[in-house]
Amino acid sequence: MLTLHRAALVLPDPADPTAPSHPDGAVLVRGELVEAVGAYAGLAAAHPEARVRDWGDALLTPGLRNPYGHWLLERTYHPDPREGVGDEPVPDGLAGERDEARCGASARRGLQRMLGFGVTAVAGPFERAAVRTAVARSGLTVLPGAGAGAGVGAAGDGVGAGVAGPLDPLAVLPLAGALHGRVAVGGRADFAVFAPGAEGVEGHGGDPVGTGGSVGTGGPWVGGCRATVLAGRLVFRRR
């Protein structure tokens, strides 16, 4: 089945300054893979049978990487809403925990929350069997981490898999520094859709992905995550 994801601005490879951007663009997905990227009008005319998901004034980019996976999933406890203790992560809530089922359930809730921020890749290492299973079933790409005791991530960006960090990478990284991979023809269809920030996405000169913005802003034009797609599946959609 073909699905056409339309957005006001599609940035398939923001890390490459020579890569094209597509105002009123679209990504055509067949199964798990990207079949085409380009102008919406042309793709819609060429594939009238495709199902259209129109994300309106949004920005479509590759998904985000979360470099804090080890700490967030192996040490942090993500409460069950039925526990009545709120939904905020509990730092070191799993330290010394021996109940694998509890660890696995916490990891599943944490992963679901990551998807809500546009995360499509997460850094390990994951030492608990229950956590490894949860991550594998989530569909997120697993990245090598810096280790449980390290303080600098594999990307050399000053953050590491073994240190504390947020579920939302954009809380500490600009969008350009948080993106993982690119949206490329023949590649796995992993991407995220973001609402525009205060400046919108029209007239997209300057710095639409935050390469010149301050850490923690996520870039001047980026709002919250509207949707996350993993291997062609819509795994999160903000209501």
Feature locations, PLM:
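Short, well-ordered secondary-structure micro-motifs within conserved domains or adaptor modules
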Residues: 2, 51-54, 154-171
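Short, charged, surface-exposed secondary-structure boundary motifs
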Residues: 63, 151-158, 216, 238
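Divalent metal-binding segments
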Residues: 71-128, 164-170, 176-184, 195, ...
